[in-house]
């Protein structure tokens, strides 16, 4: 009789959980901060970050040394 009672109780608990979930899914959900402002905050942060790095890379005078083309001249060969 014990396994039968345990099975019946577990089914009752599962049904009650399913009913609670069904009730919650039908209620109106109020938007959270992330729902309201998430994309705007992400876009604003991205724009700020890109502009700060652009300023840093172009205006503060860092010598990047990206390519030696035009700056390096070959030496003349010596005949031995």
UniProtKB/Swiss-Prot annotation:
It is a single-pass membrane protein. This is Cytochrome c oxidase subunit 7B, mitochondrial. InterPro entries: Cyt_c_oxidase_suVIIB, Cyt_c_oxidase_suVIIB_dom_sf. Residues 25-32 are mitochondrial matrix. Pfam families: COX7B. Its main location: mitochondrion. The chain crosses the membrane at residues 33-59. Component of the cytochrome c oxidase, the last enzyme in the mitochondrial electron transport chain which drives oxidative phosphorylation. The respiratory chain contains 3 multisubunit complexes succinate dehydrogenase (complex II, CII), ubiquinol-cytochrome c oxidoreductase (cytochrome b-c1 complex, complex III, CIII) and cytochrome c oxidase (complex IV, CIV), that cooperate to transfer electrons derived from NADH and succinate to molecular oxygen, creating an electrochemical gradient over the inner membrane that drives transmembrane transport and the ATP synthase. Component of the cytochrome c oxidase (complex IV, CIV), a multisubunit enzyme composed of 14 subunits. The complex is composed of a catalytic core of 3 subunits MT-CO1, MT-CO2 and MT-CO3, encoded in the mitochondrial DNA, and 11 supernumerary subunits COX4I, COX5A, COX5B, COX6A, COX6B, COX6C, COX7A, COX7B, COX7C, COX8 and NDUFA4, which are encoded in the nuclear genome. Pathway: Energy metabolism; oxidative phosphorylation. Residues 1-24 form a transit peptide. It comes from Rattus norvegicus. Belongs to the cytochrome c oxidase VIIb family. It is found in: Mitochondrion inner membrane. Keywords: Membrane, Mitochondrion, Mitochondrion inner membrane, Transit peptide, Transmembrane, Transmembrane helix. It comes from the Eukaryota. One of its GO terms (cellular component) is mitochondrial inner membrane. The gene is Cox7b. One of its GO terms (biological process) is central nervous system development. Residues 60-80 are mitochondrial intermembrane.
